[in-house]
Amino acid sequence: AVISGKKFDVGFHVTTPSSFAVQIFIKKAVDSGSKFLVLETTSHALDQYRVFGIDFEVGVLTNVTHEHLDYHKTYENYLETKAKLLKMSKIAVVNRDDESFHQISNFKFLISKLVTYGIKKNADINPENFKFKTDLIGEFNKYNILAAIAACKELGISDKNIRKGIESFVLPLGREEVIYKKDFTAMIDFAHTPNAFEQILKSVRPMVKGRLIHVFGSAGQRDASK
């Protein structure tokens, strides 16, 4: 966790810590004078009530792909769990191009306001009505940026500051991280799902003149069907 430029250890290797820890970090943010707080909320956290009691101003759903089926068992269960975040939020921001959109739109009666973003279809926020520059590679990064744009605009952040944030953004370690670049290039990326592999490999392939060698491993005791 990063609060007012200071890093805090959230403990175990989990994206969203326990409800108690989440509230502690929220209090730290409030005490530090932070105006906005971004909380990555996993399906496990939603299902286990780790964010229970939090009134989200904006809930953002990036995409719903083949992930965590060892826990949720079916795609439908996974989608319904992810949708809980949107029901907890005053404003729901969703990917208009994602295959889950049709089902998500069926939850409209539970969502106060629905805002869409996308590249291929007629979305509220798209590269045509909000132009931006970025050095990040891959279509998936464009989608992530559009999601952030939609959320920021709903929070009243100016277009100038949004573009400034996009242009200055640096990916965290382990995300498209080039660790060697001499006689060949070596890159580390966190991709570990079928969709993530497809996206990163499609993005890197045009940049490679010769062979593209992909090495990956499995942590085990997870969704084996991946």
Region annotations inferred by a language model:
Residues 12-18, 36-38, 69-74, 191, ...:
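Short, flexible loop segments at the rims of nucleotide/cofactor-binding pockets, characterized by
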